[in-house]
Amino acid sequence: MADGLNRVHYNPSTAQLVEFALLRGEGELTANGALVAKTGTRTGRSPGDRFIVKEPGSAADIEWGPVNQAFEPGAFEGLWARVEAFLADKELFVSDLEVGADPEHYQPVRVTTQYAWHQLFARNLFIIPEEFNRQNKPVWQIINAPDFVCMPERDGTNSDAAVILNFAERKVLLAGLKYAGEMKKSMFSVQNFLLPAQGVLPMHCSANVGKDGDTTLFFGLSGTGKTTLSADPKRFLIGDDEHGWAPGGVFNIEGGCYAKCIDLSQKNEPVIWDAIRFGTVLENVVMDEHRVPNYKDSSLTENTRAAYPLEHIAQRKEDNRGAEPHAVVFLTCDVSGVLPPVSILSKEQAAYHFLSGYTAKVGSTEIGSTSAIQSTFSTCFGAPFFPRPAGVYAELLMKRIESFGSQVYLVNTGWTGGPHGIGKRFDIPTTRAIIDAIVSGELKNVETVHLDTLNLAVPVAVSGVDSNLLNPVNTWSDKALYAEYAQKLAAAFTKNFAKYQVSDAIRNAGPKA
């Protein structure tokens, strides 16, 4: 319905939003029916412009610093009021949505956007409930005003844009930016703060389930394979990015997928390919003269995206929930070419590698990245989104693994035979074969070889995988150079881990420099 006075459109349909976006010049229709929108100079998240309001109710529980920057309550009130005044005479789009597919752990949220395509994104990525807010919880508010220009000296921001979370008032303000991923990550951060207090582990992971009800989780930073590997034609998708793990099961925090599109192919990623159709939002994807998307074109950004609802996936778990996971996979993209394609972790090693979050920024989702690929340590495989101290999440992970008996694996989707530029990246079929072996239970109680420097147990055989690939030293022509790189990586792990206050059992579970 539309409010004729203020031109406010409540809970608009997909078709209406696509029509509005085209009429208002916000995007273009592609040959496959998707809507392409461009986000201007900000083609990724803006971590330097993300703040949390520092107020008494939550201040003691947040790890303040460069990731979670403090914002004054008074400054927030002023900025919120200025944005509301800015939007007062604008045509707006509003939906009542939910975040969290669990009937106990959802958060209701009213999303107000200046752009039609942002509203379509929100309706694709959040959950459209059959009945809004059944438990009558206090409702969160998101306001997204991309055309509002922040003034640092007036507003207390760092630039002309800001993303601000206010836990006390249940408000999220997005001003001055068009990149839609900020909306979903803001509510992910909200749930990452709220869920641990309810005994639930929030996770930056994808999840799927087999025909027998066996759940697998895939942790990893953007570009390491979460979406690709969980979109398995033989299994049912729960979700591709954000989940909660409660006693008794896992649930999707979202209602859609936000898949990277760079180099997307029908052959390697058929599930994602088929999901891109009418109703999908394509961010910063370039088209040819016939409006056919060119997924190889990175002229606007490496971080091209497709946002679509889970309903676009044929093989999915319709309630967005699953049993507790038998297998947990940590996806790492090792640019040094040192890590094996798969390692079997003890629970102490799981805690160590969860806290370390070693991986790479692949076609980084953050603006201002100087290099397309660089190694990084990202706590909990998602440091930018976790407001509480890392130990809170690591303890919850250990607790869940122990109580259910999940087996954790470290899977390298990065390089072998040498570092990036010399070695070659593991291809998707090889990694898929490893994942198949993991989910089938093949790698439980198998013969392993121990890699001393890395302190990892590696299986000697995996069905469908060349055995020479399993021990990384075999893929390097210069064995001495491999040993040198392995020592360098072990030293980097040790240096990064020094900041954590953990038990000796966990500290000793890491690589040995």
Curated annotation (Swiss-Prot):
This is Phosphoenolpyruvate carboxykinase (ATP). It comes from Shewanella oneidensis (strain ATCC 700550 / JCM 31522 / CIP 106686 / LMG 19005 / NCIMB 14063 / MR-1). Belongs to the phosphoenolpyruvate carboxykinase (ATP) family. ATP binds at residues 185, 204, 220-228, 269, 305, 431. It is found in: Cytoplasm. Pathway: Carbohydrate biosynthesis; gluconeogenesis. Transmembrane segments: none annotated. CDD domains: PEPCK_ATP. It is an enzyme of class 4 (lyase). NCBIfam families: pckA (TIGR00224), PRK09344.1-2 (NF006820), PRK09344.1-3 (NF006821), PRK09344.1-5 (NF006823). Substrate binds at residues 45, 179, 185, 305. Keywords: ATP-binding, Cytoplasm, Decarboxylase, Gluconeogenesis, Lyase, Manganese, Metal-binding, Nucleotide-binding.
